[in-house]
Amino acid sequence: YSPAAAAAVVDASPLAEGRGEASLVRELERDTTAAGTYPIVLVSYSLACTTYEDPATAELVKAFLTYVASEEGQQQAAGAAGSAPISEEMRANVMEIVDSIS
């Protein structure tokens, strides 16, 4: 087990079907035999709207999610909860969605 192996199984798992295009929910492949993965993980999700009536609310949500996905935010979570930081690939996917919030 390593944090990178935990993040790798999430990256290697397909997106769940039937969800909106701003969803990164995964169907975790817990039976994977792919090298470098550790399939026993618990994934936490952050939920947000893609549009807000109040632009200030949208900016606050974007700032919060940007921090949560940032390297600093992930390191803080890892230290406090022992969680595995998300990969750079996942961070890029998250930020693409966060940047589209209005």
Ranges and model annotations:
Residues 1-71, 78-102:
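Flexible, solvent-exposed loop/hinge segments that line or gate ligand/substrate-binding clefts
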